[in-house]
Regions:
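Anion (oxyanion) recognition and catalysis
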Residues: 36, 73, 111
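Acidic active-site catalytic centers that drive phospho-/nucleotidyl reactions
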Residues: 11, 51, 103, 121
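Alpha-helix capping/helix-boundary segments
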Residues: 14-15, 48, 86, 106, ...
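Acidic, PIN/NYN-like endoribonuclease modules and their adjacent C-terminal/linker elements
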Residues: 1-7, 107-136
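Helix-loop "lid/cap" segments that line or gate small-molecule binding pockets
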Residues: 55-56, 76
Length: 136
């Protein structure tokens, strides 16, 4: 029986694992392959991309961070801008749950696009009742 596929929002945690070829990178790669084939849509909020950029810059240097963002822009991932609707949703999430503000943007994006969040960040356990989580 074929598993039904869901659209996904890639959280910074999952993308960083992919960038650094850590545990869970293969799952992210498989989702990107599914997105390339048109089986699913993959999203990332631009706030989370900014988070990825500064973390990658700190850990691996500016050159690597820039190269990774350049490479990431070629992947089948739709960037989602922080529209007013998403900003308000993220702010409401932040007011109610002890999540980082950037994580709230991932949740707001998943709610807007009715998508599953792909992450390994245990902080998301606090909102499992609101959105589906694909743990990597």
């Amino acid at each position: 029986m074929m598993k039904s596929m869901n659209d996904v929002v890639l959280d910074s945690h999952a993308i960083l694992r992919f960038a650094q070829d850590e545990a869970g990178a293969d799952r992210v790669a498989a989702l990107l392959s599914d997105a390339e084939k048109g089986n699913i849509r993959a999203f990332v909020n631009e706030i989370n991309l900014g988070e990825i950029y500064y973390i990658t810059m700190r850990r691996m240097g500016a050159d690597f961070a820039r190269r990774f963002l350049d490479h990431f822009s070629t992947l089948p991932v739709e960037r989602v801008a922080a529209s007013w609707e998403i900003v308000v949703s993220a702010a409401e999430m932040k007011a109610q749950y002890p999540l980082s503000y950037a994580d709230c943007f991932a949740v707001a994006t998943a709610l807007k696009y009715r998508s599953v969040i792909v992450t390994g960040d245990p902080e998301f356990k606090k909102v499992e009742h609101l959105v589906k989580i694909d743990w990597v």
